[in-house]
Amino acid sequence: MRKKQKLPFDKLAIALMSTSILLNAQSDIKANTVTEDTPATEQAVEVPQQTAVSEEAPSSSSKETNPPQTPDDAEETVADKANDLAPQAPAKTADIPATSKETIRDLNDPSHVKTLQEKAGKGAGTVVAVIDAGFDKNHEAWRLTDKSKARYQSKEDLEKAKKDHGITYGEWVNDKVAYYHDYSKDGKTAVDQEHGTHVSGILSGNAPSETKEPYRLEGAMPEAQLLLMRVEIVNGLADYARNYAQAIRDAVNLGAKVINMSFGNAALAYANLPDETKKAFDYAKSKGVSIVTSAGNDSSFGGKTRLPLADHPDYGVVGTPAAADSTLTVASYSPDKQLTETATVKTADQQDKEMPVLSTNRFEPNKAYDYAYANRGTKEDDFKDVKGKIALIERGDIDFKDKIANAKKAGAVGVLIYDNQDKGFPIELPNVDQMPAAFISRKDGLLLKDNSKKTITFNATPKVLPTASGTKLSRFSSWGLTADGNIKPDIAAPGQDILSSVANNKYAKLSGTSMSAPLVAGIMGLLQKQYETQYPDMTPSERLDLAKKVLMSSATALYDEDEKAYFSPRQQGAGAVDAKKASAATMYVTDKDNTSSKVHLNNVSDKFEVTVTVHNKSDKPQELYYQATVQTDKVDGKHFALAPKALYETSWQKITIPANSSKQVTVPIDASRFSKDLLAQMKNGYFLEGFVRFKQDPTKEELMSIPYIGFRGDFGNLSALEKPIYDSKDGSSYYHEANSDAKDQLDGDGLQFYALKNNFTALTTESNPWTIIKAVKEGVENIEDIESSEITETIFAGTFAKQDDDSHYYIHRHANGKPYAAISPNGDGNRDYVQFQGTFLRNAKNLVAEVLDKEGDVVWTSEVTEQVVKNYNNDLASTLGSTRFEKTRWDGKDKDGKVVANGTYTYRVRYTPISSGAKEQHTDFDVIVDNTTPEAATSATFSAEDRRLTLASKPKTSQPVYRERIAYTYMDEDLPTTEYISPNEDGTFTLPEEAETMEGATVPLKMSDFTYVVEDMAGNITYTPVTNLLEGHSNKPEQDGSDQVPDKTPETKPEQDGSGQAPDKKPEAKPEQDGSGQAPDKKPETKPEKDSSGQTPGKTPQKGQPSRTLEKRSSKRALATKASARDQLPTTNDKDTNRLHLLKLVMTTFFFGLVAHIFKTKRQKETKK
């Protein structure tokens, strides 16, 4: 192994910086252990750990395939939360002075929970369970007002219940937290205590009146006892699902009436869950226990920065456990009013104007601050008037943290950033050196900018004020359908800027569907409690079924005022939960089979019918009016706008439902007049959906409604895989932006930031440099023991570098436009295999690769990959934009393990979408196999005067020549370093007299340092020492630098020629024709097609210029490890496991990329000297 060498200053600096970055990344990732509830698009995230970063990225996407949803969308993250998350002793609250006994819900109750509480109580005597990533189990909000009404009166009562059900674990914490257990079995203290604490507070928090907060936290069921169950990914998704399945069973057995699960895995299908988990859901349902889940914060296919393509309508990402039919899955919306911090300004007419603010490091309350306008805060001149004042800055152009840092540097005492979008959501700003900062709406920002009196005062007590966004679905809230093709989410609840408990007796606002779910869980618990008295003859499972249907039926369908249409049922479910309407309901509506309160029509034509059943539980006949809304997706260019498009509404009709009975209603829909235009925008089909709405009077408010969804087309058989990058007309894919100057440029992994870049459908292979091939042939078995400045790298089949520049690769094509994907499976590691990489647009199953010969017979079949998850995002926090499938690697051998004959083969990938009724699909690639060794020149002459080497003949190859070069190797410090010389225009080579090291030292070169290397486009390589060429003996053993024959040669292996085969092995029979239609025995006169750069592989732009490979010399080992790990990325989205794994790879790659940049820059400077 190579000894540790002394690093120059620049290398050392980069190494230290990269190590620091990597360690920070590892720390951050370990803290973020919750799965689906990742950073919300807007202000906060359900898992705010330690310190996060807020990045305001400027609107910059010029590629039509990858536009941001809105300008500057990528920065919506969470600000610093400086809470110490260590476990704390129970809080002492008696000495804290009382400031208010008014609850948060007293001020703002958009879901009307108080009305239901008045009827059903506040959960006394009830047990509720929260399954989450971690809790502060000693928070001050965990208390009961009257312990005598508790289900478990003592620890002994709990122990008896545990014993009755064989539960031997779990602890009694206090009267409120009757049970706590960590099901993760990792033996670690929960890093994230905040998320589960916040969720539990919304469900069942009951803060004391003596709290320091201005208003008291009271959850939906404040008097219920809590079962806190920690579950975290430790050993993969399957084990994770089994752990929370056990928690579900235990919660049911310990008497929970409702279970909240604010976590999950985006885009995963319910069908792929372990059987134990499915049985746990069924068990809870059979016992009448409601499971409420969050829909997730992954928005849609493409994440929060890309809009889904209009050609691919299966863009839903709701995953598990939310995809389970038995769960109630909750989306997030922002109500029109919110409890918020406020600031006051005096307007020109001397009126006080209050405005909502979202602060990081709050300003001193009740103090009048002067402020000055600072444009977008990008340049020094913007801040000329801010010293001693607050800087008022518009959002955009640069990161939030840079705006704040610039203002601080200019002497500002604080920062106010106002939105650059109307009706936007509030954004929590980053903590920059404890600088007071706040975010305000665009409307209020413009008011401040134009106000004559530049003074603002921040108020001490929060108030309820209208939101800038109005009532709107949260942009981060995950869309349905599920991967299985089912309707989710079911219902929506407030999830934007929700104030609740966090660790260490503190309270904070967080956003996400994790905040929406526990509110609905509490309402479900109370509604079932009401039904125990109202419907005593029902079984618990019957009451659960009724409560779910009533809650969905009584939800209010949310309307998008901007689009003049209802938000899609695939985004909001049945609508906004309304506890008051649910509690008072005597009617509800279901599908025609009374299965659920949503209608899934599957595939429909232009004309169809929606049939629903109206149920009347009252003792009187009920007269209602009904109509249906008809809508679809709005399309913006080539993308879904993630907004509704209204088509039309049916006329109001009247119906009477007898007492204690039900009646069906059928609504005919005719959308034929829209089909031509809609198919022009969405060629693969589109959703026709809406709500059947009921009123007691057409002029009054909606009483109840039911969502319906149909797909005009064949949803089950939509394409599951993005077309190969080779077929792209402009060189781009959904996640890949083409080089505008060379659309066929397709760089390999190399030293590039590949993890976020090389995401498309293609075949990968491996490029092995001559030095490594030579070392292996000389007996080095472990590639890690090879000393070389060159590396083995993963590239894409059909791509080739320039002869004198291997920093970029380009697709080379046959005359028919197909890529020249050729391999030579001779064991030298150079283009020996192909492996499938795909960007999946949908979940699929049973992926298998097979190879067919020219007769169509299958010669090889891979192992089956049973589950494939759509590549719904290109984000290290979730999943990459493509997946490499290790099982699909084909080494050019048949099913018996023998190398196939030379020729052209079809490499086929087969897979089936998991949607109901889907048929198998496949994608084909043509692959040339050719093991024919090139025939190189056997003699040459050398002119010492101009140092020109002239070969006696041109190389002869079966495939076109890829590169013909002279290699030379010298020692740079203790690393053998290889560089290449390309031929001059006349075919000669100019040999240098000396080489220059990285430190500027010169190294004399001897003739024995030079080797003639020829490589064809299938990866066959032959090489001959130049000394042998000059003597006219190509098979003479290579001599060392003393011009003496080495006295020892490898004894373990027979001598091999330049083809990588033993001398007694004859070349395989040549194929009749290659993919270009030319006979392979035609020699170099048959020139390959030019690539997109206008050059053929092998043509040299500069005369005799050595090619610089020094940028690779520092990373050979790291890259080998990186490529191997990248090829084995799992096909499931194990976020907790993958995030750390991916970031380690990326940060390592980033480090070597920086090193490469320094090397390359240095060499460029040397070349110019």
UniProtKB/Swiss-Prot annotation:
It catalyses: The primary cleavage site is at 67-His-|-Lys-68 in human C5a with a minor secondary cleavage site at 58-Ala-|-Ser-59. InterPro entries: C5a/SBT2-like_Fn3, C5a_Peptidase, Ig-like_fold, LPXTG_anchor, PA_dom_sf, PA_domain, Peptidase_S8/S53_dom, Peptidase_S8/S53_dom_sf. One of its GO terms (molecular function) is serine-type endopeptidase activity. One of its GO terms (biological process) is proteolysis. Residues 1-31 form the signal peptide. Its main location: secreted. Keywords: Cell wall, Hydrolase, Peptidoglycan-anchor, Protease, Repeat, Secreted, Serine protease, Signal, Virulence. It is a peptidoglycan-anchor. Belongs to the peptidase S8 family. This is C5a peptidase. The gene is scpA.
